[in-house]
Amino acid sequence: VKRPMNAFMVWSQNERRKIMDQWPDMHNAEISKRLGRRWQLLQDSERYPLSRRRSVRLKHMADYPNYKYRP
């Protein structure tokens, strides 16, 4: 079972699609660098709405009630 996505991962999914639509030939490594820089510039309130973060976590907890992270 995978860990629930953190705020950056959820945010970057949507942003990655936008970048790929504009620049379909851009390498994934370059996209990741751009996303990282943009993420660092965002205010905490812009990064990811608290309600969405909670819903992702709550869904994961409901789907996997006995889940325990083990590295």
From Swiss-Prot:
Keyword annotations of the record: DNA-binding, Nucleus
Principal cellular location given in the protein's record: nucleus
InterPro entries, alphabetized: HMG_box_dom, HMG_box_dom_sf, SRY-related_HMG-box_TF-like
Annotated SUPFAM superfamilies: HMG-box
GO BP, sorted A to Z: brain development; camera-type eye morphogenesis; negative regulation of transcription by RNA polymerase II; neuron differentiation
Subcellular localization(s) per the UniProt record: Nucleus
GO MF term list: DNA-binding transcription activator activity, RNA polymerase II-specific; RNA polymerase II cis-regulatory region sequence-specific DNA binding
DNA-binding region listed in the record: 1-68
GO cellular component: nucleus
Protein name per Swiss-Prot or TrEMBL: SRY-related protein LG27
Organism: Eublepharis macularius
Phylogenetic lineage: Eukaryota, Metazoa, Chordata, Craniata, Vertebrata
